[in-house]
Each structure stands twice: as structure tokens, then as C-alpha cells.
């Protein structure tokens, strides 16, 4: 079976993009809400679903094909978060509510179009990816949204309408997820090439 026919049989595990809970510039919470939906609706086993934080030591990562892109230029994010569905039945798919690519998009297409390659980038822009199991993300992630306030306490971008996400242990641990030191936080940290090799078409 080739990738095209496998993709045509893929069952989407979230609402359509315009029906998802979405707040601009709060990608970490948008993905948390996707994980919550998948857990509640049981469209697939939660162990097939991962939150993927993309960043690096300098917090400068280029991603192409974003809604805020200008033409063919990438957006340089400090970090970005997407959802990975690593299905046991076929190719992996990416759910990115900020892309102009299909929602969802096969990992192979997303990696070619949105990630492209680190080969022609300066090392300061090389991407790393922290891959966290969906269940762990739901249980452990917390954000008081303070990173979205300026020095005067004003919102840089309007926050989500629902309450802040917190755990019994923490009200703010976002930096542990953005950090690409494998000794810190949850999940596994990959280089871009290792991520694509591990989760891409076998």
C-alpha cells in the first residue's frame, strides 16, 4: 500500500480546524485542548497521541507554511507546539492549527513543507523537538499565562476565555516543556532529522 492510499483511509481524530478550541499565540494550550478532546471522544488510543514542542537553545526556530508567514518566508518562532498522531495503522499525521497546510497533514508532507531541513540553516536556527505523550501532557502541563504579559501586566495577546491550566503541583511549568535539555521536563528530545526518522514512514 502506498502512502497516498493509506492517507486516504486515515480517520481524523479531532474536529475540523475551524471547530477546534483555538486562541492565537497560545499554541501550547490549543494542543492541550486537542489532547483533551481526543481523550474524551476516544477516536483513537491516547497513547498514539503526542504534544510536540519545537524550540532550541536560542529560542529561534523557523517554520514555513504558517498562517502568519509572508509569502515563502518562514516565521521565526521562539517555540511552537503541534500535535502528532503516530498511528499504528499507517503514516503519522501532524495537527497544526497555525499552518496553511491541510489539517491534519501527513508528517512526511509537513516535514518537507513546514520543517524543510536544518542542512541549509545556521546552527542557531536548528530545530529540536520535545515529544510528550498526550496523557502525560494532560496531567503535567501548567500555565498561568504570565509569559504573555508585558512589564506593565498588559496582555500581549488576548488569553483564552477558559481558566488557566494547572496541576496540583504547579501553576506554571511551561519553560520545562520549551527547554530542549533532555535532563529537564517530560518526554523525549529529538533533533529534527531523528524526529522525522523515528516517526516518519518506515
Curated annotation (Swiss-Prot):
Q: List the disulfide bonds.
A: none
Active site, UniProt feature: 27, 80, 96
For the protein in the UniProt heading, the enzyme class is hydrolase
Reaction equations catalysed: N-terminal L-glutaminyl-[protein] + H2O = N-terminal L-glutamyl-[protein] + NH4(+)
Top-rank taxon? Eukaryota
Enzyme Commission number(s) of this protein: 3.5.1.122
UniProt signal peptide? none
Please name the Gene3D superfamilies in this protein's record: Protein N-terminal glutamine amidohydrolase, alpha beta roll
The cellular location(s) given in this protein's UniProt record come to: Cytoplasm, Cytosol; Nucleus
The record's Gene Ontology biological-process terms are: protein modification process
Please indicate if the UniProt record lists Nucleus as a keyword: yes
Q: Could you cite one Gene Ontology molecular function of this protein? A: protein-N-terminal glutamine amidohydrolase activity
Q: Which InterPro entries match?
A: N_Gln_amidohydro_ab_roll_sf (IPR037132), NTAQ1 (IPR039733), Prot_N_Gln_amidohydro_ab_roll (IPR023128)
Q: What UniProt keywords are attached to this protein's entry? A: Cytoplasm, Hydrolase, Nucleus
What do the Gene Ontology cellular component annotations say? cytosol; nucleus
Which Pfam families does the record associate with it? Nt_Gln_amidase
Subunit architecture: Monomer.
Function text: Mediates the side-chain deamidation of N-terminal glutamine residues to glutamate, an important step in N-end rule pathway of protein degradation. Conversion of the resulting N-terminal glutamine to glutamate renders the protein susceptible to arginylation, polyubiquitination and degradation as specified by the N-end rule. Does not act on substrates with internal or C-terminal glutamine and does not act on non-glutamine residues in any position. Does not deaminate acetylated N-terminal glutamine.
Family stated for the protein in its record:
Belongs to the NTAQ1 family.
For this entry, the protein name equals Protein N-terminal glutamine amidohydrolase
Q: Which organism is it from?
A: Danio rerio (Zebrafish)
Amino acid at each position: 500500500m502506498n502512502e497516498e492510499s493509506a492517507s486516504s483511509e486515515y480517520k481524523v481524530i479531532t474536529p475540523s480546524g475551524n471547530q477546534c478550541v483555538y486562541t492565537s499565540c497560545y499554541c501550547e494550550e490549543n494542543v492541550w485542548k486537542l489532547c483533551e478532546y481526543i481523550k474524551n471522544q476516544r477516536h483513537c488510543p491516547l497513547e498514539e497521541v503526542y504534544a510536540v514542542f519545537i524550540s532550541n537553545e536560542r529560542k529561534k526556530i523557523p517554520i514555513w507554511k504558517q498562517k502568519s508567514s509572508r509569502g515563502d518566508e518562514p516565521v521565526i518562532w521562539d517555540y511552537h507546539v503541534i500535535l502528532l498522531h503516530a498511528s499504528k495503522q499507517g503514516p503519522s499525521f501532524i495537527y497544526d492549527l497555525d499552518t496553511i497546510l491541510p489539517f491534519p497533514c501527513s508528517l512526511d508532507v509537513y516535514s518537507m513543507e513546514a520543517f524543510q531541513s536544518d542542512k541549509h540553516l545556521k546552527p542557531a536556527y536548528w530545530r529540536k523537538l520535545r515529544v510528550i505523550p498526550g496523557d502525560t501532557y494532560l496531567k503535567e502541563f501548567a500555565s498561568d499565562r504570565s509569559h504573555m504579559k508585558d512589564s506593565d501586566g498588559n496582555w500581549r495577546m488576548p488569553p483564552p476565555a477558559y481558566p488557566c491550566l494547572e496541576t496540583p503541583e504547579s501553576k506554571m511549568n511551561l519553560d520545562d516543556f520549551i527547554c530542549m535539555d533532555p535532563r529537564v521536563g517530560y518526554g523525549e528530545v529529538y533533533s529534527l532529522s531523528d524526529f522525522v526518522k523515528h516517526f516518519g514512514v518506515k
